[in-house]
Amino acid sequence: MTLLNRGFFILLSYFFIDGNINGKENRLHTFSHPCMGTIFKVSVHSEKSRNKVEDIVQGSFKIADEMDDRFSDYSAESEVSKFNKQESHIPFRISSELLELLTISQSLYHKTSASFEPAAGALTQLWRLSRKTKRLPDQKTLSLAIKASSFASLIIDRKNKTLTKKNHLTRLDFGGIAKGYTADKMLNYLQEHDLKSCSISAGGDVIVGNPPPGRLYWIIRINPFGDSNSETMRVKLSNAAVSTSGNVEQFIQIGGKKYSHIVNPKNGLGLTTNHAAVVISNKGSMSDALATSISILGKSGLKILDHFPNTEAAIIDLNDNKVTKSPNFNKFSK
């Protein structure tokens, strides 16, 4: 099945959420907040006053900032950065949030055959340098980073809430799950404060609660080109999440070869295959992490969905412009 023209890319800022309804009493309120290197956008349908809605939404943005303070590997003062500086074989005390994210990540690591690798910080740091210098890492440095980039190099003590690295080069990088996990937290907060009909978008991740009044679902349009004339993929969701991942939007060319910003933890280099993925799941953490994993694995990545109930995916092969979907993906198509 061919859906998209040649040259397709996912421009993550071009997610649109349709949820407008007529009527003065139940209004749509939208708020934005910069965090985690992107813009978190919250849309809410509510009969409450805008001031009351804004107070609640600001509380959800505070959660996003708190998660960024814990999980960012760009901030030297974050919890993750402090762990990354820790020497090997010395237990590091961790927060409940980091322990929870590690637990989720550990399950994903095993179920995705390690294509989701949150302990690949040494590789992502090395690849950031390569993107800056436009030179591939030397083989010795790359080999050491690959060896260190494994969840198996971590020891999690859940009782005492500590994390220990076996290899001093091991680094955490939650770039493939942090936004989705944070959006889950924000959604829970909003719904606990009686804002049931809401949506949160953050880069390539969108998570929604109850549909707008009078609707059965939210309609989310994924625009590949970022202009009104291009073809879109539309999905319908209620209390679910959708994430995208693609390697065409950001790439570098080294030695005449194109490399993605997405790192394959198996070889430590950016992807060279033209794949883009769309994943729908019941949690933002799941859709976020699996979108990256399936981008790395390609069409074979759809097989890992056997381990994830209530999850569907579509992968676009940009070499032949074809879309391969999991068996029940079309039930979300609009």
Language model regions located:
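Mature catalytic core of soluble alpha/beta enzymes
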Residues: T2-K334
